[in-house]
Regions:
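Bacterial Sec-dependent N-terminal signal peptides
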Residues: 1-23
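Extended, hydrophobic alpha-helical segments in both membrane/secreted and soluble proteins
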Residues: 347, 409-423, 429, 433-450, ...
Length: 616
């Protein structure tokens, strides 16, 4: 499936890791954004986020809060847009502006705008604070008393906006009963602030003759990530917003920024990557860099792509919140592609492949907590489809209430479980393993213990599997077997470390060893199905039967050279060109095959795709 470019960049974190001195870690443009996906810059604190257009005469900020979902435990629904903020400046639209620059500083989590117009220097700053749970937008002119603006708020679901006491706010209720609210507080230095209506008759705030404007935005719902309270928080969204905004107002913009930068850099600065920073001109726009890259690869730009991926994961996934979805947390539609959901057949897992290796283990926690919180609903749904089994699994499309749709992705929960083990493998926290991860690893292993079928010859196979979005439904699909193998391996290791359930560990070990082994076909390929039907002309984007190469470790060049050779044949036949996320997966495949040149070739192809005019 296709996906948004921000999601694809999240996946590219798997390719590199290193340390260095400070580098050029920013995106740069010399004109305002006009397109949401390809030009606006994202900010986020893991819960709320925005896309900044940075227009000169009119500012447009489209914002989100990642729990605003339709649907419930039965219906999947979709992730929703939250609202839009407009700041219309009182300036002649025909007046030219010069020295325009908009910069997304990845090393600070700070978006900055600067330009000159009518003899004035205009500066803006934007950031999303995790410690204070607000977004902050600051507007300043070099000439005092010259800042005039109209500030308008808009609900993506059409509720009326209220204005009072220097605040704009709206609140509403979705069809599923979810309550939501957003509020903007306007702080004016110098000048005056008044309520009025715009040309459409909507309530707005007018700022006259100000030196500086600071906008504080908070958005919230009454969602809670626990089934025990029926997914509801006891605190009303309006009260949540008021609590955050009142505290933020006490700090002031400079202290808010200092607190934000300290929090953000504590994560971002854990990794630096030095690929010859001297190659980059500090004034060269990102688009110009991408155009230059088409002619000659620029390693420093590759480092920038890597750090942009880390920025996006930090901005869309923080402890205590929901995981990054198909679009991170940025979404401007109430009917987004694929619901902007949690796809269990690679996409949500791929979002988190980088979390541990890119030294962002704190950003892994939303995904781990999500897996845990969905268990009870998934057990109910699983019993309806697979009566009598223990444990649980998932369908392909998933929401934040346990609701799901499309086809069953039967090994999906086992793939989820890999992240539980990886978090232990990187951090060696036995308390976490014992109390959090192990019970989930065991119950998913129990699902497959009950689900697997033993043939007369003793071989064990997974029944009625489907290689994602490709081919027939039948027994012994390679995708199923490789993920089950990975699950059982991780369970066995966890049980051994904790010295728990010795007899059951022996049982699972025997079951793992009896699984149908990977098969090599007539043209030397690794078979996608037990039947040798692979087509050497097939260029399908999913390469699910290579899970055991990456992110699994069932086969490798050193351990299983024949299977590694067959994987190489399969990859060569599938080709290098594909959707962005598929290309990122292929980078990892070729790296595991110890072919760095081929991995690098696909990486350069991907970056050239990013730099194209038609980005999907």
């Amino acid at each position: 499936m296709h996906t948004k470019i921000k999601y694809v960049l999240l996946t590219l974190l798997i390719i590199c890791f290193g340390t260095s001195q400070a580098q050029r870690y920013y995106l740069l443009d010399n004109k305002p954004a006009t397109d949401w996906m390809t030009e606006a810059y994202p900010i986020g604190n893991g819960r709320i986020g925005a896309m900044i257009f940075a227009g000169v005469n009119q500012e447009h900020i489209q914002f989100n809060e990642n729990s605003l979902w339709t649907g419930d435990e039965q219906e999947t629904g979709a992730y929703q847009a939250f609202g839009d903020l407009f700041v219309r400046f009182d300036s002649d639209v025909n007046k030219s502006f010069t020295a325009y620059s908009r910069k997304l500083n990845l090393d600070k989590g700070l978006h900055e705008i600067a330009y000159q117009q009518d003899g004035q220097q205009i500066n803006r700053r934007y950031f999303a604070s995790q410690p204070d749970q607000v977004m902050v937008f600051e507007y300043a002119n070099s000439k005092k008393g010259k800042l005039n603006a109209q500030i308008a708020l808009q609900d993506a679901h059409g509720q009326a906006v209220q204005v009072e006491d220097g605040h704009l706010w709206f609140q509403g209720t979705l069809d599923n009963g979810m309550r939501y609210a957003a509020q903007v507080r306007v702080q004016v230095v110098g000048g005056s602030l008044s309520k009025t209506t715009d040309e459409k008759g909507q309530a707005v705030l007018n700022v006259k003759s100000a030196d500086r404007i600071v906008l504080l935005l908070s958005a919230a719902t009454d969602y809670a990530n626990t089934r025990a309270t029926k997914w509801k928080s006891a605190e009303e969204p309006m009260k949540v917003n008021e609590r955050y905004l009142q505290q933020a107002e006490k700090y002031g913009v400079n202290k808010l920024l200092a607190r934000h930068v300290a929090d953000y850099t504590a994560l971002f600065n854990l990794v630096e990557l030095d690929l010859d920073h001297s190659q980059l001109d500090s004034k060269q726009t990102t688009k110009a860099l991408l155009e230059a890259y088409k002619k000659q690869p620029i390693p420093a730009l590759e480092a920038l792509v890597y750090q942009y991926g880390r920025y996006l994961l930090i901005s869309s996934s923080r402890k205590g919140g929901l995981p990054a979805n198909l679009q991170g947390l940025w979404n401007n539609s109430n009917n987004p592609p694929w619901r902007s959901d949690y796809h269990s057949n690679i996409n949500v897992q791929m979002n988190y492949w980088p979390a541990e290796v890119a030294n962002l283990r704190e950003s892994a926690w939303p995904y781990l907590d999500y897996i845990n919180s969905m268990r009870e609903v998934k057990k109910i749904n699983t019993q309806k489809e697979f009566p009598g089994v223990r444990g649980w699994t998932v369908k392909t499309e998933n929401n934040i209430f346990g609701g799901e749709s499309f086809l069953w992705n039967t090994p999906g929960s086992a793939w989820y479980a890999q992240a539980l083990w990886e978090h232990y493998a990187f951090n060696r926290d036995e308390k976490y393993l014992r109390e959090f991860a192990y019970p989930i690893l065991k119950e998913i292993s129990e699902f497959w213990d009950d689900r697997l079928v033993r043939r007369p010859d003793g071989t064990v196979v997974a029944p009625k599997g489907w290689s994602p979005e490709h081919g027939p439904t039948e027994d012994a699909v390679s995708y199923d077997h490789q993920i089950i193998y990975d699950l059982f391996n991780n369970y066995i290791q966890a049980s051994t470390i904790l010295k728990l359930d010795d007899d059951y560990r022996k049982h699972i070990t025997a079951l793992r060893d009896a699984l149908l082994k990977p098969k090599i076909g007539t043209w030397g390929q690794l078979q996608e199905w037990e039947t040798d039907r692979d087509d050497p002309q097939d260029k399908h984007r999913h390469v699910s039967h290579l899970f055991g190469l990456y992110p699994g470790n069932q086969f490798s060049v050193l351990k299983t050279p024949e299977l590694a050779k067959a994987a190489r044949v399969t990859l060569t036949a599938r080709g290098d060109e594909s959707t962005g996320w598929s290309m990122a997966w292929k980078v990892a495949f070729w790296a595991r095959l110890q072919d760095g040149n081929h991995a690098y070739k696909i990486l350069t192809n991907f970056i050239n795709l990013v730099g194209g005019d038609d980005i999907d």
